[in-house]
Amino acid sequence: VKPLPPATPPAPISEDIWIRKYRFGSEAGIDDTWRRVAKAVAAAEPQDQALWAERFHGLLADYRFLPGGRILANAGTARNATLLNCFVMGALDDSIEGLFHALRESAITLQAGGGIGLDFSPIRPAGAAAVRTGNIASGPVSFMHLWDAMCETMTADRARRGAMMGVLRCDHPDIEAFIDAKVEPGALARFNLSVLVTDDLIRAVDGDDDWPLVFAGKTVRILKARILWERILRAAYETGEPGILFIDRINRENNLGYAETLHACNPCGEVPLPPYGACDLGSINLTRFISQPFTPEAACDFDAIAETARLGVRFLDNVLDVSHYPLEAQADQARKGRRVGLGITGLADALIMQGLAYDSNEGREFAARVLGTMRNAAYEASVQLAEEKGSFPLFNADAFLDRPFTHRLPEYLRDEIRRKGIRNSHLLAIAPTGSISLLGGNVSAGIEPVFAATVSRRVRRLSGDYDTIGMDDYAFRLWHEGGGEGLPPGFVTAGELSPDAHLAMQATAQGFVDNAISKTINADADMPFEAFANVYRTACDLGLKGCTVYRQGSRGEDVLTPVTEGAWCTSDTC
């Protein structure tokens, strides 16, 4: 493998993130953190643990691979905290005992550091009679407020606030109350909301058909599908939520569709999970693989990406074995399927470093080549791990290879899986990578475009107050450190891109990802509602698993604010 280019010195925000989120005890510098994490994860190896610790340290120390935040914060600390970023909780039981048992399990999981996802569809609608008591039910949204208050209480004193995803089926009788649940500012502040949209709803919208709202097999009332669809999109337009999950497509594309049905996902949407499923995440930092940036000779080392992907899969597989699990059911579920989510970050910056525009055919071709390389390397590594350590317990070769995603794998990989098995049911997911991208020098997050050359970022302190920190984008800073002026060739920001350009990149990436993708499509504040609504329909037509569109200013004060041209800042004091 070719030597990697030297890393530019970390941005000021990087040290701030390390101190607030990932530093443990008396660690003097980030290399102490890397060594702690590498040693802890290598402990899963049956032999040669010191050797694997060194290999994992090399993976981390030059920022090639950035593990999920819970891994960085908790591995090797002896804290009773999980290394897994998020979980989907068990299926809710529509009884007072069942709901408060689920609330308790959610509290235990949040206390251990995990975000959670919940499907509230099993809860009877408001106004229905309870079976045993005859009391009138208050509906799922009322119970969501209970979860929200619990989450606020459990995580109020932490730099990392509790995160929850709440979902509801599009045919639940309380779907309209769910859609409007965050219209009031500050309501359900700990939740992201998404509607589980079925193929039947899309067909009914197309046919301008009636849409029955159903609970326990009984139709409660009927409305026009088109009116419901527009109400979902109008709420998203006005408030930024709910997002949409195309749940039938998620289940069709699930590698374990022969053994489970998915109803929910993690809070950021990149990993649909079964009840008690867990997110085990890490991202390859693409900026570390671009040599001679901003020159005609700029190139990407795809062989090094493949090698990093192979080692990253082993790292994440080990995490499943060394992690603490808040609940035994979570440990059981994680080890049945051994899902991991290897992703990327820094895509937009890697494009800029090569002079490629995010919205160009060449930019999408680069993303496809990167993710195709990663997919093949990750599946190869998982087959090799199966030879060493065994396949995941739910593996059935015929059923696994009959799934849509595995059908699209190269034939040599399908043959290898049939002959040798595979260690992990899922291998790829693209997370938002907010904090770890800041740790890596403020590289562009996940597959998102660069938000702006320089931004002012609101950062929450433990006190609950917010500071404002100025930050340069990684590629922009690298360009200026090399003597460049203005903006580098190929530099384009999220706000300058059309929604179609965002969607095209997400669709390109989704074809290579067996889990899902966390992606926000940015829209101008003055975008007409009709154009906004078309984005969601295009997302459906392109085969995406989910869609979130954020219209600037629709959630009040934005976390990121661009600094206008002429006020760029490249100093370390900004």
Where are these regions (language model features)?
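Active-site cavity-forming subdomains of large catalytic enzyme subunits
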Residues: 2-9, 84-302, 325-329, 378, ...
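A structural-propensity feature for long, helix-poor, extended segments
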Residues: 125-164, 291-324, 379-380, 388, ...
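Internal maturation/activation junctions in enzymes
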Residues: 216-218, 308-331, 335, 339, ...
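Acidic/polar, glycine-rich intrinsically disordered N-terminal extensions of enzymes
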Residues: 1-83, 90, 207, 229-233, ...
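Terminal amphipathic helices with adjacent charged low-complexity linkers/tails
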Residues: 10, 14, 180, 196-197, ...
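Gly/Pro-rich turn-and-neighbor structural signature
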Residues: 41-79, 83-89, 97, 176, ...
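Catalytic alpha/beta core of large soluble enzyme barrels
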Residues: 270-272, 316-321, 403-407, 416-423, ...
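Core structural elements
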Residues: 10, 57-76, 170, 311-322, ...
